[in-house]
Curated annotation (Swiss-Prot):
Gene Ontology MF terms in the entry: actin filament binding; actin monomer binding
GO biological process, one term: regulation of actin filament polymerization
GO cellular component, one term: lamellipodium
Role noted for this protein: May regulate actin polymerization, filopodia dynamics and arborization of neurons.
Main location class: nucleus
Keyword Cell membrane: no
Organism this protein belongs to: Danio rerio (Zebrafish)
Pfam families cross-referenced by the UniProt entry: GCV_H
Name by which UniProt lists this protein: Protein Abitram
Family: Belongs to the ABITRAM family.
Length: 177
């Protein structure tokens, strides 16, 4: 009998979502974000595995969805089938600020235009989820792009292959993250 390699079944994320990436957001080296796009247009904003939060054994001290005095992502309320009432976000709209125990602060951005459906309030009390399960329970927010923009929303984003090429180049150049 011939030895067959056991193939691991794809995860739910890999099966139902397409991964897109935005690197060096706002010119900050290695501050990479990952956008998980479902076939129904919904996008889940997460941190890419190369983000500095995951480097050098950092620990998260605080996550704050209060963007400014008059704007808190926690106050976002949507209702109805078409999700009316959600805050509209541009590509560079801040979603939250994450402070690490070394006092380094990172602003997480939406990366795409669309309506904010929800933010992950669970990570406020369990910030370790962001480190342990960034693509599932440790997500940042869920955004719904406008229907007419749902195809163009990925323009300017990188595929998994393009992202891995950038990571390879960084490793060769030894760019500090």
């Amino acid at each position: 009998m011939e030895d067959k390699e056991e193939k691991k079944a794809p995860s739910v994320i890999d099966r139902y979502f397409t991964r897109w990436y935005r690197t060096d957001l706002k010119g900050k080296p290695c501050e990479d974000h990952c956008i998980l796009q479902h076939s129904n247009r919904i996008c889940v904003i997460t941190l890419a595995e190369s983000h500095p939060i995951f480097q050098n054994g950092r620990k998260i001290k605080n996550i704050n969805y209060q963007i400014s005095d008059g704007c808190s992502r926690l106050k976002n309320k949507v209702s109805g089938k078409s999700k009316r009432g959600g805050q509209f976000l541009t590509e560079f709209a801040p979603l939250c600020r994450i402070t690490c125990t070394d006092e380094q602060e990172f602003t997480i951005f939406s990366c795409i235009r669309g309506r904010l459906l929800e933010v992950n309030e669970v990570i406020l009390n369990k910030p370790d989820l962001l480190m342990e399960k960034p693509s599932t329970e440790g997500y940042i927010a869920v955004i719904l792009p406008k229907f007419e923009e749902s195809k163009s929303v990925t323009e300017g984003l990188l595929t998994r292959e393009q992202y891995e090429e950038i990571l390879t180049k960084r490793n060769q150049q030894e760019v500090p993250c």
